[in-house]
Amino acid sequence: MYRLSQYETPLFTALVEHSKRNPIQFHIPGHKKGQGMDPEFREFIGHNALAIDLINIAPLDDLHHPKGMIKEAQDLAAAAFGADHTFFSIQGTSGAIMTMVMSVCGPGDKILVPRNVHKSVMSAIIFSGAKPIFMHPEIDPKLGISHGITIQSVKKALEEHSDAKGLLVINPTYFGFAADLEQIVQLAHSYDIPVLVDEAHGVHIHFHDELPMSAMQAGADMAATSVHKLGGSLTQSSILNVKEGLVNVKHVQSIISMLTTTSTSYILLASLDVARKRLATEGKALIEQTIQLAEQVRNAINDIEHLYCPGKEMLGTDATFNYDPTKIIVSVKDLGITGHQAEVWLREQYNIEVELSDLYNILCLVTFGDTESETNTLIAALQDLSAIFKNKADKGVRIQVEIPEIPVLALSPRDAFYSETEVIPFENAAGRIIADFVMVYPPGIPIFTPGEIITQDNLEYIRKNLEAGLPVQGPEDMTLQTLRVIKEYKPIS
């Protein structure tokens, strides 16, 4: 029996062959290879892309019931990532994360999650009716960012909630730090609890020994992995890797099908196929070059007065067992400006767009799509930034914001989300139970999640983020003059 090679792209190749046959199409999409589309957009996108913007007709397989080229592409991805099964997601990693949670949890089931999870985890908890048991991540006081969860916090949570249906871990974090995932997996498996990994920012780590251990290498049961973020596929295309044992693979397939559009994007699927090929066949060399380039940037930034780019010196705690050096965190705290101010300045003065900013930092991602031309421009821009804002630093101006305690969960997120609610002024909200998500996006980590008790400290933290110009999102009232809370009833007198 013929076995496909990692150098092959069964899905992409079949799409190209189909387009070359130039069939007469009496099926959707209605633009018919671009002929029925606005000419300006058609010219910009190009004929080849529009020719493979197709639908799941018989010759092209079906993502919901793959038997041909999609199955072959998914099987190759499973082999490349060390999984037993891989499912392509065109709902992004958010769709894959929601699939993981809903595959193991039903109404009332407990799931152990770090409090710094992405909104998609909380959305899945609301849909499933699961009860989140929050584990507090380690906070870095200097950088003002959350790291991963520690082995101690996982052990404590497992001892107190041994009936949990799943443990969710972020590996690595948005900022590139990773805990000892292998030990966490072993600990959870000793309780027969499956480990679900949010690997949104770690598609590349599987392909280089110097990077943190990947979810599949660590023995995790499922991992939602963003190929588009750092692996070279198109935006919104991701994969869900699964190992057999503690999870029901057929149930996983049913859930991801429920959450996936039936109008499948073959352009996104093809981009996953070719990205897998490149990672599997060239990934190690490409990532090695990327690491070297990123380290050059890190060293150069640390030579700039008042700027700091963390590296290996951050390692040594349970939550910082390893890190991804391709994530360039630039702390501007000592310059006396916020990360958001630095982001805006870089955009306006150098036409540079960063991944995200927060109160203290900007985050830049170096991938194998970068060259020294781009990184040298970044270094020059940061040198200029330091020189311009040096006066504030010399005067001792410092941005200081206390990170508040995690709010107490009073109601399950599902109960809170579907409860009767009312809208009250922002300044009167302390002590009430929130019905909305409130988060800074990116990274999309909730400040409040439905069901939590609003505290004055957290309201002040939101206000500080707003004053700094950061994108606070979630509430119906985008001005944040009001918040939606659970309705209170007064007793009948």
UniProtKB/Swiss-Prot annotation:
Pathway: Amine and polyamine biosynthesis; agmatine biosynthesis; agmatine from L-arginine: step 1/1. Keywords: Cytoplasm, Decarboxylase, Lyase, Polyamine biosynthesis, Putrescine biosynthesis, Pyridoxal phosphate, Spermidine biosynthesis. It is found in: Cytoplasm. CDD domains: Orn_deC_like (cd00615). SUPFAM superfamilies: Ornithine decarboxylase C-terminal domain, PLP-dependent transferases. PANTHER family: ARGININE DECARBOXYLASE (PTHR43277:SF4). This is Arginine decarboxylase. It comes from Bacillus anthracis.
